[in-house]
A protein has these predicted regions:
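Domain-level signal for soluble alpha/beta catalytic cores
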Residues: 1-305
């Protein structure tokens, strides 16, 4: 096995379903922000659960710190403070562990997950900037999550232009497209990666992730990304963290109900992860419904490489 195949970083799993599993306060539309507001000890515990399972990067619990989940009034009053608190909790958990754990600041979708048709660039940029400013002092790297369109990507790039920290762009994929890797907008992964390549500068390290999509569509996205990067002779890391959901449709209403689960076992998820790694992914974790047991399976596998 060559050196590139031995390189692997373990990301954490899904915060929302983990705090729900622990019976923290959890309901729509607040989702994972409810524990942050009412019982933050559960957020500490969830981070620690993933760290103990072997996670080397943990993501701040700021995904739901947007008007879509908090409501406009609570967001205006506390959105920035909650995002800052989420980053502070993650920082504290990372610093208290005996192993090296990095904290990723989370920039989530501004208008709800999986709906590129609802994106508004001007207001989105303001929300992104608010969450960026709130977390900047506490994070080691940035992770823009569940990006569904090139329009959203471009808006995020303008926000991250002022940072010198490593930045990861995580795209959510069309769950029904197995032959062609598509963003939820219908734009191709190849188009997205070409845009990143053409717009990249040398001020900070860029990586490309794929998240919150079914595991079956990830391998093609990794292969397409690797092909574009090889064509441009670029060495950009690729990450994958899939969800444990059934397929999400294009008219999904993220606050209407909890998405149904499919209950992939740690062993089943690991089999997908091994394929992603073979195709070039070097950062692997889990999104919604992927818990500490799944992350431990990934960590144990890493130890065997």
């Amino acid at each position: 096995m060559d050196c590139s195949m031995k390189k692997l970083t373990i990301l954490d799993g899904g915060m929302g379903r983990e705090v729900k599993r622990m019976e923290a306060p959890f309901s729509q539309p607040l989702w994972s922000a409810q524990a942050l507001i009412e019982s933050p000890e559960f957020v500490y515990q969830a981070h620690n659960n993933f760290i103990h399972a072997g996670a080397e990067i943990i993501i701040a619990n700021s995904y739901a710190c947007v008007p879509f989940h908090l409501g406009q009034a609570l967001y205006d009053q506390k959105g920035s403070d909650l995002a800052r608190f989420a980053a502070q909790i993650a920082r504290e958990c990372a610093d208290k562990t005996s192993t090296l754990v990095q904290v990723a600041g989370c920039i989530p979708p501004a208008f709800g997950s999986y709906r590129p048709d609802l994106f508004e660039p001007k207001l989105g940029g303001i929300i992104f900037r608010t969450l960026f400013d709130a977390q900047e002092d506490y994070v080691d790297l940035w992770l823009a999550e569940t990006i569904c369109s090139l329009e959203e990507l471009k808006c995020l790039q303008s926000v991250f232009a002022s940072s010198t920290k490593p930045t990861a762009y995580a795209f959510s994929l069309n769950d029904d497209s197995l032959e062609t890797a598509l963003l939820r907008s219908g734009e191709t992964v190849i188009q997205a990666i070409e845009h990143i390549v053409q717009s990249a500068d040398n001020t900070n390290t860029i990586s490309v992730y794929f998240n919150c999509s079914v595991p079956e569509v990830m391998a093609k996205a990794v292969s397409d990304t690797k092909a574009v990067l090889n064509q441009h002779k670029l060495d950009i890391e690729i990450g994958v963290y899939a969800n444990n959901f059934t397929a999400i449709k294009s008219n999904h209403e993220a606050n209407s109900a909890l998405q149904s689960m499919r209950e992939l076992s740690p062993e089943e998820y690991l089999a997908f992860a091994q394929e992603w790694h073979l195709r070039g992914a070097t950062i692997i974790g889990g999104c919604c419904g992927i818990g500490p047991d799944h992350i431990k399976a990934l960590s144990d596998w890493k130890a065997s490489l």
